[in-house]
């Protein structure tokens, strides 16, 4: 079963932060959502223009930079950034990346549903919902007039959502970068099962028991707990203090507990995701660190990875772009240069053609026509052996 894909976005449903109601106090329906007693309004995660995608699906907050000059033209390749998933996740986790690239190319970072300034509350959180948020973001960029496929970078569990999105709409994505991706910790590669999750239902029931669910969430998101989990992520005492402060405020927003509890129960993980990674038709960059809790990538040594893969390992924790930003950027940019140098090789074109033929035919009539034309051209090129 393929992922459910988004409907076309209606331009009027996209609101600029300059004209929209205060995003710190509204829901997707426009109703005021009160802060808890003593609560602090959540400021923007990034110093950038905010946009909000209203339906279909949960309201999604975007942080957008379209610099003047070459990087801001509609022929430039946008970079889409997706944060990880944890008890206090948000686009604030992407700050070093956003700040580095915002001045030189179009960049958009999103708050996934249930996090940051996107819609929160008791929603049906699932991998399909998160995947759809990424696809809606790319579709929005297309609506702004950006003509090039995007470079996609996702962190930790969001790598799974990114892979699903890239497989669902292969021609929307120029490359896929997975930072500390989940699903590569075991040498036993189970079949990919997009219609299922790794949810433990008994655990989910325990977590959501009204007798203690609020107290449990408060314990998981206290300042001490958030600091503890960041230290485990960094594998070091030297965490980013600005991220800590933002996470503390983000975790206490109204409706904040629902998505993290779905995450803890396993409801956002997809079985066999490693097999999907290996099938991605786009060039893939995988990077990870060697410290902390996220260092098990045994599957990488047992997978027959495509020639279009590049794997870089940093002597850091799970978020290397915080600790070695210059080195991280240089490795990523080297990967992008390699993508440009090899994108016309027969193997790459053949993989894209096969993926396009297998992907659903969705989107606007223009997008459908472009995909069909590209598929036909790629079939001819592959047959001729170019």
Residue spans of the language-model regions?
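Active-site loop/oxyanion-hole signature of alpha/beta-hydrolase fold enzymes
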Residues: 66-69, 95, 109-153, 330
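Conserved alpha/beta-hydrolase catalytic His-Asp/Glu region
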Residues: 214-278
């Amino acid at each position: 079963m393929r992922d459910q894909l988004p409907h076309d976005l209606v331009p009027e449903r996209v609101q600029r932060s300059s004209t929209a109601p205060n995003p710190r106090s509204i829901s997707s329906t426009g109703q005021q959502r009160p802060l808890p007693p003593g609560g602090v309004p959540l400021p923007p995660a990034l110093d950038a223009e905010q946009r909000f995608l209203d339906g279909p699906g949960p309201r999604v907050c975007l942080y957008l930079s379209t610099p003047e000059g070459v990087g801001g033209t509609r022929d430039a390749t946008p970079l889409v950034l997706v944060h990880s998933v944890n008890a206090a996740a948000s686009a604030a986790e992407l700050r070093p990346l956003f700040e580095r690239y915002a001045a030189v190319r179009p960049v958009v970072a999103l708050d996934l549903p249930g996090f940051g300034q996107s819609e929160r509350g008791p929603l049906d959180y699932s991998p399909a919902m998160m995947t759809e948020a990424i696809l809606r973001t790319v579709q929005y960029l297309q609506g702004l007039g950006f003509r090039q496929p995007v470079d996609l970078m996702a962190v930790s569990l969001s790598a799974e959502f990114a892979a699903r999105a890239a497989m669902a709409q292969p021609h929307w994505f120029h490359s896929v970068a997975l930072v500390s991706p989940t699903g590569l910790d075991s040498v036993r590669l189970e079949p990919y099962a997009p219609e299922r999750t790794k949810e433990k239902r008994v655990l989910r029931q325990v977590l959501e028991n009204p007798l203690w669910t609020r107290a449990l969430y408060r314990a998981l998101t206290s300042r001490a707990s958030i600091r503890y989990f960041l230290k485990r992520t960094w594998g070091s005492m030297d965490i980013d203090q600005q991220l800590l402060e933002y996470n503390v405020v983000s975790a206490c927003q109204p409706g904040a507990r629902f998505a993290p509890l779905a995450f803890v129960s396993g409801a956002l993980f997809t079985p066999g995701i490693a097999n999907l990674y290996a099938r991605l038709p786009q060039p893939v960059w995988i990077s990870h660190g060697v410290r902390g809790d996220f260092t098990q990538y045994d599957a990488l040594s047992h997978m027959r990875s495509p020639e279009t893969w590049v794997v870089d390992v940093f002597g850091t924790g799970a978020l290397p772009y915080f600790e070695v930003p210059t080195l991280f950027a240089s490795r990523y940019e080297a990967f992008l240069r390699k993508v440009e140098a090899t994108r016309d090789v027969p193997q790459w074109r053949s993989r894209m053609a096969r993926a396009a033929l297998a992907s659903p035919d969705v989107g606007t009539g223009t997008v459908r026509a472009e995909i069909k034309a590209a598929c036909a051209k790629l079939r001819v090129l592959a047959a001729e052996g170019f």
